[in-house]
Amino acid sequence: MVKIHLSRLLGEKRMSQRRLAEATGLRPNTINELYNERAKRIDFTTIERLCRALDCKVSDLFEYIPQRDEN
């Protein structure tokens, strides 16, 4: 699974979801899906916009967490 650290980053930057949407040009709904870790996919342009607006690296925003195979 991939963990999205958007809520933590917004808290650290004291930035609202609305302000991030305005800074990135992304739809508020898209920001909310990422914030609540409900997004099913994300494109490179979105990642680039988020990293630029948050002044962070991709590794600050996402974390890969291996899952145990439950077969």
Predicted features and spans:
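Short alpha-helical DNA-recognition segment
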Residues: 15-33
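Short, charged recognition helix plus adjacent turn
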Residues: 33, 62-71
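Short, basic-rich loop-to-helix N-cap that marks the start of a DNA-contacting helix
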Residues: 38-49
